[in-house]
Amino acid sequence: MQQMLQEKGYTIVPFDETADIYIVNTCTVTNIADRKSRQMLHRAKQKNPAALVVAVGCYVQTGREDVEQDPCIDLAIGNNRKKDLASILEEYLQDLEQEDAVAENAENAGHGVDKTLHDTTVIDINHTAEYEEMTLKQTAEHTRAYIKIQDGCNQFCSYCVIPYARGRVRSRRAEDIIREITGMAQNGYREIVLTGIHISSYGIDFDEEAWKRGESVSVLKEDEERRDYSGSSKLIDLLERIHTIEGIERIRIGSLEPRIITEETAVRMAALPKLCPHFHLSLQSGCDATLRRMNRKYTSEEYAESVALLRKVFDHPAITTDVIVGFPGETEEEFAQTVGFLDRIQFFEMHIFKYSKRAGTRAAVMSHQVPDPVKTTRSAELLAMEKEQSKQFRTHYVGREAEVLLEETKEIGGTEYLLGHTRDYVKLAVSVKENKKNVANTVICGRVQGFLTDEILLLSPLEFSK
């Protein structure tokens, strides 16, 4: 959206500066996200009461009634019209000018004009069957580009509002993805991350015959959510095509469903040297009874098998995950099963969330809601476990050689360092004094000396790669 506005002549300023137009890309994944979205919108109006405040994104989709009644929001745009933001703004501003002119003429003629009412204009929040194409040329980061490959989700986990906010699965045409990544490579980006709402579903909405002809034609299928992931996954097909793009040296993939990892997909991924051995496999719970209530589509044992397959074909891959504690009905025994499972798998990183109700979801009306103090206790236990497992994973690299893509400069303990990540996303630091070139977006090799901080390892450089 920022890119489109700049191309139309708008000047982008930091959010805390006074602006004529404020655009807040809202989130609704949790109640906290809702609240933060509202706070940002209200801050904008307080900063400049005369400014046009625009809400776009998921909160607009799920909270239409609240959005329409919020006096701080002037214009609300649904997810499927983000690509039209610039033209919508221009049309809206033209309408305002016309209304002001009419009001001025009326006042000059001695007629009163009622300006006390507030109306929020809501632009199309209905979901579409097609992917909303928005191609990026550059991103805020200078070394890593995030490439969106699909939108929507068909899973309908019992705690999640995202399918209602983002709609059904819509996959982006492979041709558009390849073109965007090629452009990013030409602009100097060396690493890309494939993102989406549910990227394991990439391509399930494509017409099979069209795909065989090399075309990506999106179609609606009644049984989309029942289609299984297999070794012929369109996601793996896409990875293989991206792998051939010159200039891209690292490919990362976003969150995956465990069942997409089969023997065949694991082998195909391992055959791609550019693919980073860094996999986020969504878990949520290590207890099968809890997983069933969550409407997750796998068992804990199936999850463990997926991890084993990745560890079989990749050398020491980084496995990360999400875990929800305090889901409705989670007993002490069920939580203990999750603790045991997490200890068995051993992750690089875990994102721990305390369950919170989302209006309109099945979980919100389930019986046996877990008290907040219990959630807090369970969360603290898993956070302590996460810290220990993460340290153990990083310790593996001490004394070993590693390759890092330098990204930014930061001062730590009075010393200036260049920071970057390994292929499996371990953060390393090299002293600027030792790095004579002092250039971000440079790949260097070195030996890991030890821990600089709890989360950053210190690298002694051996050579610059390129």
Question: Where are each of the predicted segments found?
Answer:
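Aromatic/acidic polysaccharide-binding cleft in carbohydrate-active enzymes
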Residues: 354-368
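Proteins enriched for Cys/Gly/acidic motifs involved in redox and nucleic-acid/cofactor modification
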Residues: 1-202, 209, 216, 234, ...
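Conserved, mostly hydrophobic/aromatic
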Residues: 157, 177, 194, 253, ...
